[in-house]
Amino acid sequence: FTGDLADQQVLEEFARRVIQDYGRVDCIVHNALPLMKGIDQCSYEEFNYALRVGVTAPFYLTKLLVPYLAPGASIVNISSSRDRMSQPQTESYTAAKGGIAALTHALAVSLAGKARVNSISPGWIDTDFTSYTGPDADQQPAGRVGNPLDIANMVLYLCSDQAGFITGENICIDGGMTRQMIYHNDF
């Protein structure tokens, strides 16, 4: 299924198709990359688009699927470590990722007894499986840059019964970067 998550009709068609094909929902993973533009380049329309993809779509799709949640269902939202720290010119992305992190704990309370809702905030994740060495790896307390399996393993865990007592949490998977203070000439 392909479509623009910012389009309400696409979300409604997707939800209809899921229920038609499967009848119930065990796990929802919201993982969309909204537009990444900053204050110098991002238009009003682009900023709103980023929020529609990154926050409104997960909210609305969850709303559409709530009546079909199976017992023990889990919802995992993918946020970003940028929900707690920033780089210049990333306001649209940062706002959307901060929004999904806040939506996570709100939904966890509203959906109590129906689904567990958590989010993951990845840090630097190399999707090309490049082996980074030197300063790129050294600055990471974990000693390496993350890879998609680091995130996938947490998603699988949060969707499993083993995580049955975890809800409303935002788990940062960034190799410890948000816990480390870096000053000029530290690395």
What does each of the following model-derived ranges do?
Residues 119-120, 134-166, 173-175:
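C-terminal helical subdomain
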Residues 67, 108-113, 164:
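Alpha-helical segment proximal to the catalytic Tyr-Lys
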Residues 40, 85-91, 143, 148, ...:
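Active-site loop immediately N-terminal to the catalytic Tyr-X3-Lys motif
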Residues 38-51, 136:
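Substrate-binding pocket helix/loop in short-chain dehydrogenase/reductase
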Residues 167-187:
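Short C-terminal tail/terminal secondary-structure segment
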Residues 62, 96, 104:
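Active-site helix of classical SDR
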Residues 31-36, 176:
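Conserved NAD(P)H cofactor-binding loop of Rossmann-fold oxidoreductase domains
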